[in-house]
């Protein structure tokens, strides 16, 4: 069964297609569809109630001009950790880290931006999380004229080292 995004101002109903192989989520991942693709982080921070829960750490949408926003609240990190996102063919990917209601970090990348702006020289994106004893909320905005597929997960240094080749 696919979760659905409820109908709100600027957000329309759509069944979310998720992958069956992704384990169930223990973080509070939520999604907002911005049909206008015009919302900025300041707008999104005012619309937190319009985000809808995701059952999996992945989604697939057909090609469209809309933007998709992810939101997740994470506890304070005790060890070096990163947000890993695999989103092939995402044209624009914007990452925002908010702590205590303040924007702490933003990074803009994606296939339509210069390759040097990518956190890694691959289709995977890796964003460091602060180890400062404070909980955080992450927001990720994605757009693409291609089908939009994304898999995402917070990962630890140990996890990254275990997957090095």
Predicted regions and their residues:
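Conserved small/polar residues in nucleotide/adenosyl-binding loops
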Residues: 158-165
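Short tyrosine-centred short linear motifs in exposed loops/low-complexity segments
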Residues: 78-80, 133-136
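Structured loops at beta-to-helix junctions and adjacent beta-edge loops in soluble globular domains
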Residues: 73, 130, 141-143
């Amino acid at each position: 069964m696919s979760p659905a995004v409820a109908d709100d101002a600027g957000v329309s109903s759509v069944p979310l297609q998720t992958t069956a192989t992704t384990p169930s989520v223990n973080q509070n991942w939520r999604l907002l569809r911005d049909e206008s693709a015009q919302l900025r982080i300041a707008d999104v921070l005012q619309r937190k109630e319009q985000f809808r829960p995701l059952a999996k750490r992945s989604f697939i949408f057909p090609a469209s001009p809309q933007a998709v926003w992810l939101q997740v609240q994470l506890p304070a990190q005790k060890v070096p950790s990163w947000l890993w996102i695999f989103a092939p063919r995402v044209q624009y990917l914007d990452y925002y880290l908010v702590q205590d209601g303040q924007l702490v970090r933003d990074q803009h990348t994606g296939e339509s931006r210069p390759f040097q702006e990518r956190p890694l020289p691959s289709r995977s994106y890796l964003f460091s999380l602060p180890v400062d004893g404070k909980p955080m909320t992450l927001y990720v905005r994605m757009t693409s004229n291609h089908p939009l597929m994304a898999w995402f997960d917070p990962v630890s240094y140990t996890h990254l080292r275990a997957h090095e080749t």
